[in-house]
Amino acid sequence: MSHNMKGQKKRLAKAHKQNSRVPVWAIVKTNRKVVSHPRRRHWRRGSLDVK
């Protein structure tokens, strides 16, 4: 990833952080009613609109 602007790198980092799974404590607290979140993005299937 050469010649990336700092803003673009920052947005990619944010998208990377947002793509994490639901925390274990949330799954335990809700008695497994919440096990996944709908905004999860797969690296191959979902496209990322980062400018």
UniProtKB/Swiss-Prot annotation:
Q: Basic residues compositional bias: what residue ranges?
A: 1-19
**Keyword entries, A-Z:** Ribonucleoprotein, Ribosomal protein
Give GO BP annotations, semicolon-separated. translation
Please tell me whether the keyword Ribosomal protein is annotated for this protein.
yes
| A Gene Ontology term for the protein's cellular component | ribonucleoprotein complex
GO molecular function terms listed in the Swiss-Prot or TrEMBL record:
structural constituent of ribosome
Q: Where is this region: Disordered?
A: 1-23
| InterPro entries named in the record | Ribosomal_eL39, Ribosomal_eL39_CS, Ribosomal_eL39_dom_sf
Similarity section: Belongs to the eukaryotic ribosomal protein eL39 family.
The cross-references to HAMAP family, in alphabetical order and at most eight, read: Ribosomal_eL39
What is the official name of this protein in its record?
Answer: Large ribosomal subunit protein eL39
* The organism of origin for this protein: Methanosarcina mazei (strain ATCC BAA-159 / DSM 3647 / Goe1 / Go1 / JCM 11833 / OCM 88)
Taxonomy, top ranks, is: Archaea, Methanobacteriati, Methanobacteriota, Stenosarchaea group, Methanomicrobia
